[in-house]
């Protein structure tokens, strides 16, 4: 084996756990990434449309704006190279919950569960939007500071428990991997993405280095 937790292989643990019971009947070369790409594309459009419906009830306007989410270049740059990180519908769903007037905390916990079972990076982003939502609730006087603390720390410890169960804290010792120093982020990367193979922006071109 690889002697490393599944969550560190970018293999979408949610799908792995779903198909694990059927290992004996599935082909040896079976993979679920194509299924996930199709599902992510569908969910990307669904949550984009639901988010747009908050701002407009016009079906045509919502449909057209949904296309911008569905055909966003950054979505296709990631979904085929890294299907787990390409699950950007999680972020759109989080924004929908933030903006929706009928959001309840059960939906946030469900979304966080799926995010953790898909990709840790996306979970961190979803958690950040959740914190912003809870602070907004406090500012609108829908909750008090005590409930805010319970909602944030309760979700934090629930997430830690789930991360421990799934294997986020399991680090193997048998794998040697390179890339350190190459896959790094300079402090000016917010202004200079330093694209390796293409120009990311004509407005803000790469800085000389």
Regions inferred by a protein language model and the residue ranges of each:
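Short aromatic-rich membrane-water interface segments that cap or initiate transmembrane helices
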Residues: 2-7, 119, 201-209
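Coil-to-alpha-helix initiation sites in intrinsically disordered, low-complexity, charged segments
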Residues: 12-16, 58, 178, 182-185
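Membrane-interface coil-to-helix junctions
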Residues: 1-43, 72-87, 191-197
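Membrane-embedded helix bundles of polyisoprenyl
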Residues: 38, 42-55, 60-137, 155-159, ...
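Transmembrane helix-loop junctions in multipass membrane proteins, especially transporters and channels
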Residues: 28, 77, 138-142, 167-176
């Amino acid at each position: 084996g690889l002697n490393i937790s599944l969550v560190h292989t970018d293999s979408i643990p949610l799908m792995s756990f779903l198909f694990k019971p059927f290992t004996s009947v599935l082909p040896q070369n079976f993979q679920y990434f194509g299924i996930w790409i199709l599902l992510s594309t569908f969910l990307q459009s669904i949550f984009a449309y639901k988010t747009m419906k908050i701002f407009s009830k016009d079906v045509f306007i919502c449909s057209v704006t949904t296309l911008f989410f569905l055909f966003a270049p950054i979505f296709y740059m990631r979904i085929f190279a890294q299907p787990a990180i390409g699950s950007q519908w999680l972020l759109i769903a989080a924004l929908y919950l933030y903006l929706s007037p009928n959001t309840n905390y059960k939906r946030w916990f469900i979304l966080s569960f799926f995010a953790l079972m898909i990709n840790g990076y996306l979970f961190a982003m979803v958690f950040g939007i959740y914190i912003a939502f809870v602070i907004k609730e406090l500012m609108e006087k829908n909750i008090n500071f005590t409930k805010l603390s319970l909602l944030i720390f309760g979700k934090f410890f629930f997430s830690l428990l789930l991360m421990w169960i799934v294997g986020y804290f399991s680090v193997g010792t048998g794998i040697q991997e390179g890339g350190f120093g190459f896959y790094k982020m300079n402090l000016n990367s917010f202004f200079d993405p330093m694209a390796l193979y293409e120009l990311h922006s004509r407005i803000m071109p790469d800085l000389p280095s």
